[in-house]
From Swiss-Prot:
Function: Specifically methylates the guanine in position 1207 of 16S rRNA in the 30S particle.
Species of origin: Pseudomonas fluorescens (strain ATCC BAA-477 / NRRL B-23932 / Pf-5)
Species lineage: Bacteria, Pseudomonadati, Pseudomonadota, Gammaproteobacteria, Pseudomonadales
Gene: rsmC
Entry-linked Pfam families: MTS, MTS_N
Protein name per its UniProtKB record: Ribosomal RNA small subunit methyltransferase C
PANTHER family on file: RIBOSOMAL RNA SMALL SUBUNIT METHYLTRANSFERASE C
Molecular function (Gene Ontology), one example: 16S rRNA (guanine(1207)-N(2))-methyltransferase activity
Family membership noted in the UniProt record: Belongs to the methyltransferase superfamily. RsmC family.
Assembly mode: Monomer.
HAMAP family in UniProt: 16SrRNA_methyltr_C (MF_01862)
Any one GO CC term of the record: cytoplasm
Subcellular location: Cytoplasm
Length: 332
């Protein structure tokens, strides 16, 4: 069981009423708290929760419509996302209890200060390298719209400026990261047909490809509901139409693709996690048509080339710079 869930269960008597668990782990906590419901924005966690506890976890960027008497936020990595989520919960909990739980190394003690606008927070427990904080919501805020927290910036591209709409919690929020910047310079000669932006984030790659190759069918895929929402906003801001999916890794992608483009993620919260990328490299051939191409940008120190060659075919380094490499391979 997740250590944060273990800390909650040390205080289980506090959590017997109607409770919302926001950002919960995909463990047995719902089984131990029969009156609790979940709210997840991670497609993999949501699928696991739905399989074990059907109908008890809500997925998306907005809090569930059902009422709740108290709520626990599992601290996310992003401070901006924490602000949005605490606001969404506190706005529904006037005079009631809001809890924050997180690992010490994720900065939960500092994040507890974000409870100050709502009342007087206090630390309830410290165990398993985690802390549990509580505040009685004396000052319930007006709910913020997610779009009011969006950051917009423009990328000067050959086809004209591209507007990017980035939401809290999305990778490289409010700015272009170096890996994607390098890949944007090397989108020439993509195969015609159906192209996938894997781990789409705010939709920079997918939107750029759709504008440059308007006759191609473009799909954008991410595990995170906030990323999918960002991608939809980016596409709309540029008058583009493409399919946006949420799903847990390459297994959620369509079959019969002509190309896969990715600046793949390697963090889950504060933890380094290469599983989604390695799974993509192992299974890309299954999702690509014969002659279909995989184009990956990654940190130069990551040894992806042997993995690509083992599972897909000969792999070339198309470009490198700023500590990144672009790998290119085709399915034979």
């Amino acid at each position: 069981m997740d250590t944060r869930s273990e800390v909650l269960l040390r205080q289980a008597e506090l959590f017997q009423g109607s409770l919302l668990l926001a950002g919960l782990a995909a463990d047995d906590l719902l089984g131990r708290l029969p009156n609790a419901r979940g709210w997840s924005w991670h497609a993999g966690d949501q699928a696991a929760l739905e399989a074990r506890f059907p109908g008890r976890s809500h997925f998306g960027v907005d809090a569930p419509a059902q009422s709740f008497d108290s709520a626990v936020l599992f601290l996310p990595k992003s401070k901006d996302l924490t602000d949005y989520l605490l606001n969404a919960l506190a706005s529904r909990l006037a005079g009631r209890e809001l809890y924050l739980v997180g690992e010490k190394r994720s900065g939960v003690e500092s994040a507890a200060k974000q409870l100050n606008p709502f009342g007087k927070p206090r630390k309830l427990d410290s165990a398993r390298h985690c802390q549990l904080w509580q505040v009685t919501v004396a000052n319930a805020p007006e709910p913020l719209t997610l779009q009011s927290l969006a950051q917009e910036y423009e990328l000067p591209l050959a086809e004209g400026p591209l507007k990017v709409i980035s939401l809290p919690g999305v990778f490289s929020h409010g700015r272009l990261d170096r890996g994607t910047a390098l890949l944007l310079e090397h989108l020439d000669h993509l195969p015609a047909g159906h192209l996938l932006d894997f781990g789409c984030g705010a939709g920079v790659l997918g939107a750029t490809v759709k504008r440059r190759y308007p006759d191609s069918r473009v799909t954008l895929l991410d595990v995170d509901a906030f990323a999918a929402a960002s991608s939809r906003l980016t596409l709309a801001a540029n008058g583009l139409e493409a399919e946006v999916l949420t799903g847990d890794g390459i297994d959620a992608a369509p079959m019969g693709l002509n190309g896969i483009l990715t600046n793949p993620p390697f963090h889950t919260g504060v933890h380094t996690d290469y599983q989604a990328t390695e799974n993509l490299l192992r299974k890309a051939a299954k999702h690509l048509q014969k002659g279909g191409e995989l184009r990956v940008v990654a940190n130069s120190f990551l040894r992806y080339q042997p993995l690509i060659e083992e599972h897909l075919g000969p792999c070339a380094i198309k470009a490198e710079g700023q500590g990144f490499r672009i790998y290119r391979a085709k399915r034979g």
